[in-house]
Amino acid sequence: MTTRIDLGRLDGAGAEHEAAPGPGPGPGAGAGRESADPRRVRVSRRAAEALGRRLESPMPWQVARRTGPDRTLDGSMRPAPVPPHDPDDTTDPWEELGGLGLVDASGRLFPELPGALDVLARPETAVDLDLVVRRPTTGAAPVAAPGDGAGPGGSTDVQLRAWHRRRAGRVTAVATAGAQVEIGWFDDRSWAAELARVAAVTSALAPTPPARDLTLPHELMLGVGVARRTDAPRLTEELLRRHLPHMRVPEGADAREQVQLLHSGVVGRLRAVVSGQGDDGRRKVGWVSWLLFSDGWRTLRPHVDSGVSQVGVHHVEPSALGREVARLVAGVAS
């Protein structure tokens, strides 16, 4: 079972996302206007859902449960994760929200909240992010790849889900990890930095990574992954025999070894799915796929070369996520 984690801590080395403010901004702050600076508040699942009911803006996991299962990063199917709640916690959600300054004694909400949750419910563009990072643990339970739960060599997977919704220059983001829910809202000029914040993780695990730039046939990349999960070495050999001539690796690198390292060295995965309505009224979808290694992220860029479906595997920094998402946002809106 996948371990879900504190929003502020994403790996065994103690790497942290930027901390959200403790107490909320208070009903008097920013009244009558929307702040250009990102605002974030962390609440329980109960409190987040109470806000959603009050404003008729359901939380993303509630929508996902109604629309069916979600595809995980490793291609398997499972229901979209629902943030857990402590059954022994009897705190009234409105008392919790009041303590954060998000509702006053008369029941009036912090002025920016209705607009933020309206963007969440009625966006022009949606970005769903799924992040899985492998970290060390004391136990050992061999599993193939991040996204499956327990991992090889005494490791386990930690997961963060985030939903970003944009409309008319404003973005509302909801993220879940464990029992915590973070709700944020900001001007879309801050969006690239907020996306980079999601990808700003590392892992304390340090398997040998592949080269920073590779190109290989799509069938080879997927097929070797299947062969490894099903313990089919003959299939691996046949795929290598057929596709190695089409690989491009740095000078001096061994292509066969690079294929193996591309799978054995993975310590995390990130997927961003972008959707929106185009000028022709049709719903359009695009996606970004990244793999995390001990020396950083690689983006996967599919393309066709001389009639062969290929995947470029290239090193990127977390800041590149904003650029890749922006390109897709422009595409789905056209």
Labelled PLM ranges:
Residues E96, L100-V127, E237-S264:
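Negatively charged, low-complexity tracts enriched in Asp/Glu with abundant Ser/Thr
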Residues R54-P58, L100, P123, V201, ...:
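Surface-exposed polar/charged interaction patches
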